[in-house]
Amino acid sequence: VTIDYRKHRKDIIQRIKQVGDFDYFFLQRGDDFPIGILKSINRPKFFWASELVSRNRDQDRLLNSGLFEHVFVHTLACKRSIIEKGWLTEDKVTVLLNGFDPESHYPIEGIKKDIDVLFIGNMLGRRRKWLDEIKRSCNLYEAVGIYGADMVQLVNRAKIVLNIHSEEYLDTETRLFEVMACRSFLLSERLSEDSPFVNGLHLVEVMDVKEMISSIQIYLESSELRQKISNGGYECVMENHTYLKRAELLLSLFTSYYKTGQNLSVDPIQLKKAVLESFYLYEKNRLLDSYRQLRYSIRKRFK
């Protein structure tokens, strides 16, 4: 059973009551998920801290709660940070790389490559600075807030797709897997140490914006080289990095923690104690969402 807890913050306790018996509890992201609900669950619990530990501190309360049998993190740096803080031991933390769904991200055969260079993603200050330099020397297409089928179309149309980190922290973004799944050529800023990709075989990595600009010129002139590398990336992600592969990894670990017992999956008395905390966290997020919407409206009006 899957519950979108962000969508159902207001009635999350009711939703959990409706689930009935289950074998495992798996929480992804976990921002402002009630600790009281976790305490009420009598089955093995797992947490996927899918954002960088260094910049998403709202995960701290879950990571140091001691309530999870095992935790999955975004990078090796995240794993080291958690262990150094004494929150978890090494055997309780696993790096879980991102992946993709082949039904959502795929090559479009015969599509015209009419976009020279594409950046697709959220526009933050660091990226804006890089792109302002890049667009002086090439035809750059910027796509912000584009997802789903529209994203797949753009990525397939591009000769070169750029990957630029949102901050100074090195990362291996989900977008990498999605672009390679479209069999598109990827030119990326240097990736984090846990990247499964080989520079020059699956994609091309650069050290700085100047090298990215010079690499754009080189690879725009060589469709054969772009095709060779994009084929390598496509084969790599299809073989190793689909969400099905990730699910198989999770299942193998979940089953190692399997417990039999006559107790209920959720302790109703403990769950009742979580009502007040759940209401507070719902109201907190409702007010924050209202504030963000108001701020966006004001900025849009005076832009």
What are these regions (language model features)?
Residues M123-L124, D208-V209, Y243:
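Short beta->alpha junction loops/turns
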Residues E167, G200, Y234, M238:
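Conserved short-loop catalytic and cofactor-binding motifs
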Residues L203-V209, I218-S223:
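Conserved acidic donor-binding segment of nucleotide-sugar-dependent glycosyltransferases
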Residues L67, R175, S215, G232-G233:
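Short, hydrophobic/aromatic alpha-helical segments in well-folded domains
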Residues I216, E221-K303:
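C-terminal amphipathic helix plus adjacent low-complexity
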Residues V1-F22, L27-S40, P44, A49-N199, ...:
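Nucleotide-sugar donor-binding catalytic core of glycosyltransferases
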